[in-house]
Design a protein with these regions (language model features):
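Long, hydrophobic, amphipathic alpha-helical segments used as structural scaffolds
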Residues: 83-86, 118, 141
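Charge-dense, low-complexity intrinsically disordered segments
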Residues: 62, 94-97, 120
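Selected N-terminal structured segments and early membrane-anchoring regions
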Residues: 1-88
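TerminUS-proximal long segments
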Residues: 124, 139-142
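Non-transmembrane amphipathic alpha-helical segments
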Residues: 96, 100-117, 133, 137-140
């Protein structure tokens, strides 16, 4: 759906049936921007999601915004896993979040490699790489 519609979409996902706490709700959205190569196409970032919450949870008020772009940015801000830096625009913030996610996956792969490695000298090398990756991830997360 997101690829077909050329406007930002905020998805509300529902899980379960019936009444009460069995029904859960999650909000998901992806940042959309026009493609640099083809103006008729849109480029999607990865999806940002909220936690699953009971459907009976009280809804928060919509943020105040002067136009739809600012409203969508304010709604995305609540779903982002990292805080915004001062003077950081939404596209830069999205790029930093995606870079941090890639770095996190790289840390997990390196940790798995460290566990599988048997030779001590290779473990020392992998551990040094792991420390560098973790410090880079920490820099991105601030």
């Amino acid at each position: 759906i997101d690829g077909a519609v050329q406007f930002p979409i905020l998805f509300e996902l529902n899980q379960g049936q019936g009444q009460g706490d069995q029904v859960k709700t999650q909000v998901a959205a992806a940042y959309k921007r026009p493609s640099e190569a083809d103006a008729s196409r849109w480029v999607l970032s990865s999806y940002f999601t909220s936690d699953w919450m009971p459907a009976t949870t009280a809804r928060t008020a919509m943020p105040l915004a002067l136009d739809m772009a600012h409203l969508y940015a304010a709604l995305l801000q609540g779903l982002m896993p990292l805080p915004v830096r001062p003077q950081e625009g939404l596209p830069d913030w999205i790029a930093r979040v995606e870079l941090a996610a890639n770095k996190r996956r790289e840390v997990e792969k390196t940790q798995a490699r460290l566990i599988k490695e048997k030779q001590f000298n290779r473990k020392v090398e992998i551990n040094a790489i792991l420390r560098q990756l973790k410090s880079a991830l920490e820099q991105l997360s601030r």
